[in-house]
Design a protein with these regions (language model features):
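Hydrophobic, well-ordered secondary-structure elements that form the walls
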Residues: 306, 339, 363, 400, ...
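Cytochrome P450 heme-thiolate monooxygenase catalytic core
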Residues: 102-255
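Conserved cytochrome P450 K-helix E-x-x-R motif and the immediately C-terminal K′/meander segment
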Residues: 29-46, 53, 279-334, 340-344, ...
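Cytochrome P450 catalytic-core helices
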Residues: 250-276, 399-419
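A structural signal for well-ordered alpha-helical segments within the folded catalytic domains
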Residues: 108, 134, 138-142, 253-256, ...
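Cytochrome P450 proximal C-terminal region
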Residues: 388-450
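Conserved cytochrome P450 K-helix/beta-meander segment immediately N-terminal to the heme-binding cysteine loop
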Residues: 344-382, 387
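N-terminal membrane-proximal hinge/A-helix region immediately C-terminal to the signal-anchor transmembrane segment
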Residues: 1-89
C-alpha cells in the first residue's frame, strides 16, 4: 500500500454475499449463464464503486468451500495475492514482542488449573475423578489471550463463554473432518455433505471478534499490523484465526496428548522428569527461567516424542507445483503431475519403523536424548516441516513452532514442580486424547514444595 493512501482511514470492503445459499446460487447463475464471467465482475465493480469487493465466487453450494471472497480486481491490489508474508510477519512480530510474557502468564494460568484439579479431587462428590480437557479448554483460551495481548478473555464481555464460542466456530471450520459419534445417516448429510450455515455461528464470531479488536488495539498489535501495510480489520480477522484456530485449537489437543503419553509412561519417567526439572529450577535460584527450561533435555525429548507419536494436525494437503517424481521409503519412484492434490497422513510417516526402529509405535520418553537421538529429529514433522528447521516468512512451516515446544515444556515443568507422580485414565474424544485425573502425589522435594 502506498504511503499516500494511508493518510485516509481504512474503510470496510464494500459488497454483499446476499442470503446464505440463495445468494451464492443466484451469483453462480449470473456467473455461468445470465452475465458471463467478465460482466459478472465488471457489473459488481460498477455497483459498489470499488475494485476491491466482497462477492461470492462459483461453484459455491454444495460442492466447494465457502464461496465468499474479497475479490481484488485492479492491478494495484492484486499483487497482495502473491504475498502472504505480511500476515506471517505480524505473527512473528507478535510472538517475539510477547516472549517475556509467556513464562509468567503460563505459570499463573496453569497453576490455577492444577489447584482446581486438587480441590476437585479432594471433593467427595467428584468421585475422585477430574476431567482435564474441560479445565484445559478454559485455561488455554485465557492463557493465549493473556500471553498474546495481555488481556484474559474471561475478564472481558466474553466472560467464561470464550472457549465454547471458539469450539463452536472450530466445529464450523473442521466439521468435514470430524465425527461426533452420531449415526452415519445423520452425520453424513449434517457434517460431511454441506457446509454448516455460517449465520448460525456469526453471533459467536462477532463476540470473539469484538474481544480481539479491543485486546489487539489495547496491546498495539493492530498498530504494528498497520505499519506492515495490513488494514486493522484484516489484521483482526487474521489474529482471530491464528489465535482461535491455530493456537487454541492446537493447545486443546496438544496438552491432553502430552499428558496422556506421560500418564501412560508411568512413575519411573515421572521421577526422572521431576529430578531434571527441580535441579534446573534450583540452579536458576528457584525460578522458572527460559535458560533453565533450555537445560531440561529429557523434558524436551518427551515433548517431541508426544508430538511425533500423536501429531495434533494429522492431515496435510498440497498441490504439486510442477511435474515431479516422489520416492517412497521402499525406493520406488512415482510420477506426479503438476496440479495434482497431494495428501499426507502424518501419523503413518512419523511411526515409520525404518526410521524409529522396533519401538516406533511406542512412547519412548528419552528417544531424542544424546547424539543418536538428535539425528532422529529431522523425522519429526508435526509443524509442517522438519523439527530441525525453522519457520520463516518464506515457508509454510507453523510460525508457532517454537512457542508450541516451549509451552509443552512449561506444562511438564508446572506438573512436576507440583507433583512427584500422578495417575489418570486415558481415552479419546473428538480431536484427540481425553484425560481424567484420578490422583496426584504432591512434591516431596525441590522448589515445588516451597
Ligand atoms: C499444538 C499446536 C500447533 C500445531 C500442532 C500446529 C500445526 C500446524 C501445521 C501442521 C500447520 C500447517 C498447515 C498446513 O498448511 O497444512 C500450521 C500452520 C500454521 N500455524 Fe500452527 N500449529 C500449532 C500452533 C500454532 C500457534 C501457537 C500459532 C500462532 C502463531 C500457529 C500459527 C500457524 C499459522 C499462521 C499457520 C499457517 C502458516 C502458513 O500457511 O504459511 N500455530 N500449524
Amino acid at each position: 500500500m502506498a504511503s499516500s493512501d494511508r493518510s485516509s482511514a481504512p474503510r470496510p470492503v464494500p459488497g454483499s454475499y446476499g442470503l446464505p445459499v440463495i445468494g451464492a446460487v443466484r451469483d453462480r447463475l449470473d456467473f455461468y449463464y445470465f452475465q458471463g464471467q467478465d460482466k459478472y465482475f465488471d457489473s459488481r465493480v460498477e455497483r459498489y464503486g470499488s475494485t476491491v469487493v466482497r462477492i461470492n465466487v462459483p461453484p459455491g453450494p454444495f460442492m466447494a468451500r465457502d464461496p465468499r471472497v474479497v475479490a481484488l480486481l485492479d492491478a494495484k491490489s492484486f499483487p497482495v495475492l502473491f504475498d502472504v508474508t505480511k500476515v506471517k510477519q505480524l505473527l512473528f512480530s507478535l510472538l517475539q514482542s510477547r516472549k517475556d510474557a509467556v513464562v509468567p502468564t503460563f505459570r499463573s494460568n496453569f497453576s490455577a488449573l492444577f489447584s482446581t484439579v486438587e480441590s476437585q479431587l479432594a471433593a467427595k462428590e467428584g468421585g475422585n475423578k477430574v476431567e482435564f480437557n474441560k479445565l484445559n479448554d478454559a485455561t488455554s483460551f485465557d492463557f493465549i489471550g493473556e500471553a498474546y495481548f495481555g488481556v484474559r478473555p474471561s475478564t472481558t464481555d466474553l466472560g467464561s463463554d470464550g472457549p465454547s464460542k471458539a469450539a463452536k466456530w472450530l466445529l464450523w471450520q473442521l466439521h468435514p473432518l470430524v465425527t461426533l459419534g452420531l449415526p452415519m445417516i445423520i452425520e453424513e448429510p449434517l457434517l460431511h455433505t454441506f457446509h454448516l450455515p455460517s449465520f448460525l455461528v456469526s453471533g459467536d464470531y462477532k463476540a470473539l471478534y469484538s474481544y480481539f479488536s479491543t485486546a489487539a488495539s489495547q496491546s498495539r498489535v493492530l498498530d504494528t499490523a498497520q505499519s506492515l501495510g495490513l488494514s486493522r480489520e484484516e489484521a483482526c480477522h487474521n489474529l482471530l484465526f491464528a489465535t482461535t484456530f491455530n493456537s487454541y485449537g492446537g493447545l486443546k489437543v496438544l496438552f491432553p496428548g502430552l499428558l496422556a503419553g506421560v500418564a501412560n509412561a508411568g512413575q519411573k519417567l515421572h521421577s526422572r522428569l521431576a529430578n531434571e526439572i527441580r535441579a534446573a529450577v534450583a540452579e536458576a535460584g528457584g525460578k522458572v527461567t527460559l535458560a533453565a527450561v533450555e537445560k531440561m533435555e529429557l523434558v524436551k525429548s518427551v515433548v517431541w516424542e508426544s508430538l511425533r507419536l500423536d501429531p495434533p494436525v494429522k492431515f496435510q494437503y498440497g498441490h504439486a507445483k510442477t511435474d515431479m517424481q516422489i520416492e517412497s521409503h521402499d525406493g520406488v519412484l512415482f510420477q506426479v503431475n503438476k496440479g495434482e492434490m497431494l495428501f499426507g497422513y502424518q501419523p503413518c510417516a512419523t511411526k515409520d519403523a525404518r526410521v524409529f526402529g522396533p519401538t516406533a509405535r511406542e512412547f519412548v520418553g528419552d528417544r531424542f536424548l544424546g547424539e543418536k537421538g538428535k539425528k532422529l529429529l529431522k523425522y519429526v514433522y508435526w509443524s509442517n516441516g522438519r523439527e530441525t528447521e525453522n519457520p520463516s516468512v518464506d515457508n509454510k512451516q507453523c510460525p508457532g513452532k517454537n512457542f508450541v515446544v516451549l509451552v509443552g515444556r512449561l506444562f511438564l515443568v508446572e506438573l512436576f514442580l507440583r507433583y512427584d507422580t500422578f495417575t489418570a485414565e486415558v481415552g479419546t474424544e473428538l480431536l484427540g486424547a481425553k484425560v481424567v485425573f484420578t490422583g496426584v502425589t504432591k512434591a516431596t522435594s525441590g522448589p515445588g514444595t516451597a
